[in-house]
Structure formats: C-alpha cells, structure tokens
Amino acid sequence: MLNIQRKEGVALKETISSYDDLFEMLDSFLREPVTFWNDFYEDREKNIPFFQVNGPDENLVEYMETTIKPNRVLELGCGPGRNAIYMAKQGCKVDALDISENAISWAMDRAKEEDVDVNFHCKSLFDFSFEPKSYDFVYDCGLMHHLAPHRRLTYLEIVKAALKPNGYFGLVCFNTDGAINTSDWEVYKSGSLKRGIGYTEERLKKVFNNDFNILSFRKMKKITQPNGQFGEDFLWASLMKKIN
C-alpha cells in the first residue's frame, strides 16, 4: 500500500484545481529543495568531489572543442559556477540557474575572481522566464537526477522550449554506480529521492529519444584531482541535438 505523508511545515491548498496544484501536492511528499540545497552549499570546504575543482566538466570541454560553438547558453543547476565560468571564457553569453542562494553567492565570487561576466539567477528552472527558442545550448550537470519524477516531463518541455532549432543539450547525471536505480513509484512509496536517481542507459535514453538525437553517450572519464577539469565515472555524460 502506498503510504504517503506530507512533510512537516508545508502548507497546501486542499483542493486540486490545476496541474500546478497537483505538482505542489506531490512536491510536499518529498524534501523541500531550497533548504536542502542551501544547507548542501553552506560549507565550501566540504568533501564533495566537485567542490574541490574550479574547472569544467571534462565532457563539456570535449563538446566545446569538437562539436559545438554556442553563443547563448542556459545552464541548469549551476552550483558554484564551474561550467558557466568556463563557457563564458569561451565567449558564450551564459544564463546560469540554481535554487540555492549559497551556490549562487559562491558562483558569483568565483566569477569575480576570474573577471568573467555570467548572468547568475537564484531561480528554479520552473520559475525562470526566457524567450522561447533563444538558446543554442542547454547544459545540465547534476540537476535532472535530483528531480522528482512528476517534474521530469515539465523539465523536458522547458529544455525543448529554450533551445533554438538544431540546438544542443548536454546532460551529466548519475548512472547506477552513482545512485540506486530507484523506480518512479518507489520514490513516492518511500517518500524520498535519497541521494538522487541512478539511471541505466536504457532508462535515460528512453526519456530523450523522442525529442533528441543522441550524438554522444558514455560514462564520464574519472579524473584524479587536483586537475583543471572534473570527471567521475559514476556519471553519464551525453550530448544531444534537438529534433525540430
């Protein structure tokens, strides 16, 4: 039997009259993301793999050097700004989003140190306003695998809406070495996303196959630190092209 309990401190309307109401109700059964991610980014010295690296993802460097030359870029879940700063240094105009004030503050500090201009926004992807079909490239390192299943379809629609025709989408997310391959139903049965959802290759490709041509799909290369780039092999790295 599905045993769902509302998380403490969450006030909801008792009548569902829209999809937003439905999503808000389902959100309430899981952890509150803003508080969770603010706490996560509070200690910049924490022993988290990507906290120890200032440079970009190794796969992103590969994409930029071999396949894509974007002008306008949208980064989802930018964290401390490693990838946004790298892309800005390559001449891109970057909008970078994160729901954590602590993450955005850290990212802005790094950008100032590097003397780089990035448009950082402390916003949820679902609350961010943009001109449709205005980005050449959308990049997500680590957001999607922390999304509740009921948010995944909206996430996909937003990515598609943001991209220009023939635009590119880059994704880094947990494989099953990085997190458990939790079923969508199990997330709600347990009332927890735990440390995130680990995707098999088949499951991840199924999410995107109808809307994107998958150009590259592999495990990230594990890079020993210190290094100017980040890479861990418990993550998938994929580059896709929007099907118009």
Task: Indicate where each model-derived feature is located.
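A short acidic, Gly/Pro-enriched loop at the edge of an enzyme's catalytic core
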Residues: 130-138
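Short catalytic micro-motifs in class I SAM-dependent methyltransferases
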Residues: 142-146
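Class I (Rossmann-like) S-adenosyl-L-methionine-dependent methyltransferase catalytic domain
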Residues: 2-74, 80-130, 147-158, 162, ...
